[in-house]
Design a protein with these regions (language model features):
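Flexible, processing/modification-adjacent segments and terminal tails
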Residues: 42-115, 140, 208
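Short solvent-exposed loop/turn micro-motifs enriched in small/polar/acidic residues
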Residues: 5-7, 29-30, 84-85, 114-116, ...
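N-terminal mature ectodomain segment of secretory-pathway/periplasmic proteins
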Residues: 1-50
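Short, basic/low-complexity N-terminal boundary segments at the transition from targeting/disordered tails
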Residues: 1, 18, 65-73, 122-137
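Gly/Pro-enriched, hydrophobic low-complexity segments
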Residues: 99-199
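Gram-negative outer-membrane assembly/targeting C-terminal domains
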Residues: 195-209
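Short, surface-exposed beta-strand-loop junctions and turns on beta-sheet-rich folds
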Residues: 29-32, 51-53, 138-139, 168
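Short, exposed beta-strand/loop patches in secreted or surface proteins that constitute
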Residues: 11-17, 35-37, 85-93, 121, ...
Length: 209
């Protein structure tokens, strides 16, 4: 499977086959045409088709930026990964609709560098769509985000959504952000909108790890 889309003047591509994946981010920077490539266990940055050497801090920053955008774009893909720890919480109502509330964390072994992050998903009890999600993170000083889905559409049978992106003070528990949303405590900071989405279900993985 291959998925491509544009997000904030950057082009993203995900190629996934039998557990192998290659995530790519391409954009024009001051140095030239930049292409970040993140596969199962390797990251590299190309500038004008030449690989450049990166220190560990920059490598992590670029890798996280590439991975996080594609991760959220492809939800709920990968939520059944063996390293995911799931906890069904108390069901809640948001805007008059009933939701299953599921907390997810990642194991230290196989969960990546951000294994301490916490994710919460609100799953509609009627159609089982993820209408809301939240997460806490520790990089760059930490913080929390709450996202409200809109513009849901299916392309080649795969559901894509855009999101209204909210925040509150960084120590607020991600698990309680539904309450903060319902009581108008959150601040809207951006919209997460995917453009020019394309799906090729017949594509095989070209670049092996």
């Amino acid at each position: 499977m291959e998925v491509e889309f544009d997000f904030r003047k950057r082009h993203y591509r995900a190629k996934i086959t039998n557990g192998e994946y290659v995530y790519e981010r391409t954009f024009r920077g001051k140095e030239g045409m930049i292409k970040d490539v993140w596969s199962n266990d390797k990251f590299k940055r190309m500038i004008d088709q030449e690989e450049v050497k990166l220190n560990q801090e920059n490598m992590r920053t670029y890798r996280t930026a590439t991975n996080s955008v594609i991760y959220f774009a492809l939800l709920p893909f990968n939520l059944d990964d063996p390293v995911v720890n799931r906890q069904l919480m108390r069901s809640v109502e948001i805007k008059g609709k009933s939701y299953y509330k599921v907390e997810m964390t990642y194991g230290k072994n196989g969960g990546g560098e951000d294994f301490e992050d916490v994710y919460v998903y609100w799953i509609n009890k009627e159609d089982f769509t993820i209408d809301y999600l939240a997460y806490s993170y520790n990089i760059n000083g930490g913080g929390v985000r709450f996202r409200e889905a809109y513009n849901s559409r299916e392309i080649e049978g795969i559901r894509f959504q855009d999101y209204k992106n909210y925040t509150i003070y960084k120590d607020f528990p991600a698990q309680e952000l539904d309450y903060a949303f319902e009581t108008d405590q959150l601040k809207l900071i951006s919209n997460i909108e995917l453009e020019n989405v394309r799906v090729d279900l017949t594509s095989s993985l070209v670049e092996k790890r």
